[in-house]
């Protein structure tokens, strides 16, 4: 029997000796490689966090002591140790195990975290709550995988350091997020060892000098300042101590005994402590260790022996189309520069970086800084293209509004993973951008439907000089091009019902990548003898006035988008028609305003009613209801014009 098969809770880990822990670590790695190879997921980060996680669960008592995972994709080992090993066969699948911590799965999970740099703020609040409630509970926050490049971490550290609350911060220093971590902070993380005896002596000296009138406190400050100055000259690792945090490390994060010893010292101290663990992403799996790009940060279905994809990728992705096009644009325009927040490879900038290494800027996990820095680049005469996941632009709304739009800077935002992302779950769905960006004055939004329109609209966006632009598209493969059969103003007409159908009953406004779905819907609706026209506005902010004329020629307008309904494009179409005094009803179909669980994109869309068959049924029902209402109005009008029975002139 394997050791791993006997582990169902953290208590089972506590009974093991050193040799058994080493064996268990190896078994966990083997399990991870084979499990994630079957389903896909974040492999590299978790291979690097095995011993670290074992040590945490040996030293602390979860769930009484709370363990928080920043960049929650590094929590797989934690899930294994807390009784979820048997669920890994459905990792990131609908109804299966989440790829991030989940309160619904386990009492050992408290924050459902995948947006980076937040765990320390949670830890600050939790530890304050426990202190006020008189509960002696430790809070352990595991940060790393690039999270410390986010400014929110440092805001939290500043507050945590000003207390004596029991917060243990484990810095999982693998030097990478998706790729090598960028910035001065990454260079600054190195060794500052803390001896308990030294701290005890320092406290005694402080107490003695503190009892000496007038000169005691200034003398201590002077001596302490000399010590700090010498330390900073000899080893440039003083930033944590300068904040007021005790520091243990660096520790070999792949030596479970060393990690356990460091964590016990940190726990015994009783106040806020940094434990600096040096780890390697992909550790123990040669295929991952040899992958210079991202150490198998996230993989699809692979061969566990070779690490190669099980099947060749079929079709072209939205990201790869963008990658090719931005290189072409960059070759023609030397003023075009690109920026990303620790996502160089995932957003498709690797080729641009290779072609123009001095024109790509990776600022780390710092979306707010990225947006305002881009505004500065534009002010300096360049044309910045900020490439970011749609969900992460949520974090920089104020900067988009005030620093870019208010200054009318021609910054282009390329939002990858817009709409429903699928397996990454609620925190990664990009279903809010077309709502919150609608309120930004002077900003234009393009939603391409296919590869051809992505190329065209990206070119249009980069060529715009009057304010910011956005180009948004989903994760995954691009469907075949859907060429326009006509154009009305700037609106593409994609479909008109056959002549046999009654015309001008439904105007179906398709938004972005929902075009294949809308064309499917149109065929189903037309088969019922209903006249339907499908159009793509291309730019969804501002909406083309041609939509008003098109709406006037139809009895019903239907909008379909992979964005939240509240404040989405459908709502804007309805407002456009109201403002133009066009009395045509609008039915808006979009994503439900709730956090959606992980699963394949098509399955999630079906759950919220955006599958073609469901949409077609609703459109047909809406047409029937509309016709019934119109017939009722006509009958009522006829009756009102009739002379009442027995009537006549008086």
From Swiss-Prot:
It catalyses: D-glyceraldehyde 3-phosphate + pyruvate + H(+) = 1-deoxy-D-xylulose 5-phosphate + CO2. One of its GO terms (molecular function) is magnesium ion binding. Keywords: Isoprene biosynthesis, Magnesium, Metal-binding, Thiamine biosynthesis, Thiamine pyrophosphate, Transferase. GO terms for biological process: 1-deoxy-D-xylulose 5-phosphate biosynthetic process; isopentenyl diphosphate biosynthetic process, methylerythritol 4-phosphate pathway; terpenoid biosynthetic process; thiamine biosynthetic process. It holds the Pfam family DXP_synthase_N. Its cofactor is Mg(2+); thiamine diphosphate. Residues 631-650 are annotated as: Disordered. Mg(2+) binds at residues 145, 174. SUPFAM superfamilies: Thiamin diphosphate-binding fold (THDP-binding), TK C-terminal domain-like. Binds 1 Mg(2+) ion per subunit. Belongs to the transketolase family. DXPS subfamily. Catalyzes the acyloin condensation reaction between C atoms 2 and 3 of pyruvate and glyceraldehyde 3-phosphate to yield 1-deoxy-D-xylulose-5-phosphate (DXP). HAMAP family: DXP_synth. This is 1-deoxy-D-xylulose-5-phosphate synthase. It comes from Parafrankia sp. (strain EAN1pec). The gene is dxs.
């Amino acid at each position: 029997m394997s050791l791993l098969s006997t582990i169902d809770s953290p208590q089972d880990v506590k009974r093991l000796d050193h040799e058994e822990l080493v064996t268990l670590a190896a078994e966990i790695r083997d399990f991870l490689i084979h499990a994630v190879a079957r389903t896909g997921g974040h492999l590299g980060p978790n291979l690097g966090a095995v011993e670290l996680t074992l040590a945490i669960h040996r030293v602390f008592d979860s769930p009484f002591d709370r363990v928080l995972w920043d960049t929650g994709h590094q929590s797989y080992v934690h899930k294994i140790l807390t009784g979820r090993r048997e669920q890994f066969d459905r990792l990131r699948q609908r109804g299966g195990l989440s790829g991030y911590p989940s309160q619904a799965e386990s009492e050992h999970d408290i924050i459902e975290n995948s947006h980076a740099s937040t765990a320390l703020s949670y830890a600050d609040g939790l530890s304050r709550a426990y202190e006020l409630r008189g509960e002696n509970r430790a809070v352990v926050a595991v940060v790393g995988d690039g999270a410390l490049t986010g400014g929110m971490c440092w805001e939290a550290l500043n507050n945590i350091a000003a207390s004596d609350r029991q917060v243990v911060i484990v810095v999982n220093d693998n030097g990478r997020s998706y790729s090598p971590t960028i910035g001065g902070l990454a260079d600054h993380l190195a060794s500052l060892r803390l001896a308990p005896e030294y701290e005890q002596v320092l406290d005694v000296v402080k107490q003695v000098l503190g009892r000496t009138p007038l000169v005691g406190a200034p003398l201590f400050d002077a001596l302490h300042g000399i010590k700090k100055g010498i330390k900073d000259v000899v080893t440039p690792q003083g930033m944590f101590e300068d904040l007021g945090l005790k520091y243990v490390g660096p520790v070999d994060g792949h030596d479970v005994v060393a990690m356990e010893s460091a964590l016990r010292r940190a726990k015994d101290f009783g106040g806020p402590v940094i434990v600096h663990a040096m780890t390697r992403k992909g550790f123990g799996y040669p295929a991952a260790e040899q992958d210079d790009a991202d150490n198998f940060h996230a993989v699809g279905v692979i061969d566990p022996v070779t690490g190669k994809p099980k099947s060749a990728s079929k079709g072209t992705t939205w990201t790869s189309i963008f990658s090719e096009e931005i290189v072409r644009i960059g070759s023609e325009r030397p003023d075009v520069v690109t920026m990303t927040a620790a996502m160089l490879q995932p957003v498709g900038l690797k080729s641009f970086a290779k072609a123009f290494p001095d024109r790509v800027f990776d600022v780390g996990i710092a979306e707010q800084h990225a947006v305002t820095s881009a505004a500065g680049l534009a002010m300096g005469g360049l044309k910045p293209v900020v490439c970011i996941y749609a969900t992460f632009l949520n974090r920089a709304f104020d900067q988009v509004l005030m620093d870019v739009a208010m200054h009318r800077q021609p910054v282009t935002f390329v939002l990858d993973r817009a709409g429903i992302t699928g397996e990454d779950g609620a925190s990664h769905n990009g279903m809010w951008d077309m709502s919150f960006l609608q309120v930004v004055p002077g900003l234009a939004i393009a939603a391409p439907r296919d590869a051809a329109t992505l190329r065209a609209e990206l070119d249009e966006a980069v060529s715009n000089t009057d304010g910011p632009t956005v180009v948004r598209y989903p994760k995954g493969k691009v469907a075949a091009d859907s060429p326009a059969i006509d154009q009305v103003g700037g609106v593409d007409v994609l479909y008109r019902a056959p002549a046999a159908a009654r015309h001008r009953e439904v105007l179906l406004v398709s938004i972005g990548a929902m075009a294949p779905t809308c064309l499917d819907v149109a065929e189903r609706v037309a088969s019922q003898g209903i006249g339907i026209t499908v159009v793509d506005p291309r730019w969804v902010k501002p909406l083309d006035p041609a939509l008003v004329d098109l709406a006037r020629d139809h009895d019903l307008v239907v909008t379909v988008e992979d964005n939240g309904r509240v404040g989405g494009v459908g709502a804007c179409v309805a407002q456009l028609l109201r403002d133009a005094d066009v009395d045509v009803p609008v039915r808006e179909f979009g994503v439900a305003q709730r956090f959606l669980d992980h699963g394949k994109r098509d399955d999630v869309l079906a759950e919220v009613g955006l599958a073609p068959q469901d949409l077609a049924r609703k459109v047909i029902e809406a047409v029937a209801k509309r016709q019934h209402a119109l017939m009722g109005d006509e009958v009522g009008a006829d009756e009102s014009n009739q002379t009442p029975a027995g009537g006549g002139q008086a």
